[in-house]
Amino acid sequence: MNRASLEKNPHEVASMFDGVARRYDLTNTVLSLGQDRFWRRATREALQLSPADKVLDLAAGTAVSTVELASSGAWCVAADFSVGMLAAGASRRVPKVAGDATRLPFDDGVFDAVTISFGLRNVVDFSAGLREMARVTRPGGRLVVCEFSTPTNGLFSTVYKEYLMKALPAMATAVSSNPDAYVYLAESIRAWPDQRALARRIEAAGWSDVRWRNLTGGIVALHAATKP
């Protein structure tokens, strides 16, 4: 299986990410034109972490995002359902756990904060995933979802869609070990809810005080929420 369908069979999606793990970080930096570093930093800042916090970084992949979070001094664990991705990040000295976002291997209320970056689109039932994130977060704890979204400027949105469907696959062919995975990426972004619709889904999953902030003109949005 080289490319997961938008039906998101969990085993196929995990296999797809296993296949791109070796060059995943480099590919992301190239395809985002270096914006991935800014997005990781913005996610950390939105969580407002302290050294006393316990943080779950879900869909952490190679744990590059977890290392960014841990720079705050908080205790952070990387979780991902792609064993290949976790293995590719073996040199990063943070705790790592293999796990499914809809069945997390953690007790209730053990985390002060939970975050997921560019992974919610890949969860077979992302509303169930959001509920599971709420389960493992203590009352008053924080959620930050960093995800591709909908550009707010009409002209920019048109240019971005052209990039997604034409330029991105061509660039992925040059730098990725599995270019088909990035065709799936483009298609899944186009099918994803916009900022307001995602905020409603987060609230429906049991989170409160849901708000969002656009990054890079709305290419990415940070949704933040609180566990009641």
Curated annotation (Swiss-Prot):
Gene Ontology MF: a single term: demethylmenaquinone methyltransferase activity
Gene3D superfamilies, per the entry: Vaccinia Virus protein VP39
GO biological process: menaquinone biosynthetic process; methylation
Domain of life: Bacteria
CDD domains: AdoMet_MTases
Keyword Translocase: no
Keyword vocabulary terms for this entry: Menaquinone biosynthesis, Methyltransferase, S-adenosyl-L-methionine, Transferase
Reaction catalysis annotation: a 2-demethylmenaquinol + S-adenosyl-L-methionine = a menaquinol + S-adenosyl-L-homocysteine + H(+)
Enzyme superclass (EC): transferase
Pathway given in the UniProt record: Quinol/quinone metabolism; menaquinone biosynthesis; menaquinol from 1,4-dihydroxy-2-naphthoate: step 2/2
NCBIfam families given in the database record: MenG_MenH_UbiE, PRK00216.1-2
Function as written in the Swiss-Prot or TrEMBL entry: Methyltransferase required for the conversion of demethylmenaquinol (DMKH2) to menaquinol (MKH2).
HAMAP family: MenG_UbiE_methyltr
Family membership: Belongs to the class I-like SAM-binding methyltransferase superfamily. MenG/UbiE family.
PANTHER family tied to this protein: 2-METHOXY-6-POLYPRENYL-1,4-BENZOQUINOL METHYLASE, MITOCHONDRIAL, METHYLTRANSFERASE
Full protein name: Demethylmenaquinone methyltransferase
Organism listed in the record: Mycolicibacterium gilvum (strain PYR-GCK)
Lineage of source species: Bacteria, Bacillati, Actinomycetota, Actinomycetes, Mycobacteriales
Annotated gene: menG
